[in-house]
């Protein structure tokens, strides 16, 4: 669970920037997939 929380924290912080958020989402999606 700690890993999930650690992964979500940066996402919320970066999520403030739509452009960066999209890049992060695509990277995470590819990595998890």
From Swiss-Prot:
GO molecular function, one term: toxin activity
Protein's name in the database: Alpha-amanitin proprotein 2
Species this chain originates from: Amanita exitialis
UniProt keyword annotations, A-Z: Hydroxylation, Thioether bond, Toxin
Entry-annotated residues carrying (3R,4R)-4,5-dihydroxyisoleucine: 11
Modified residues ((3R,4S)-4-hydroxyisoleucine): 11
Matches recorded under NCBIfam families: amanitin
Family according to the record: Belongs to the MSDIN fungal toxin family.
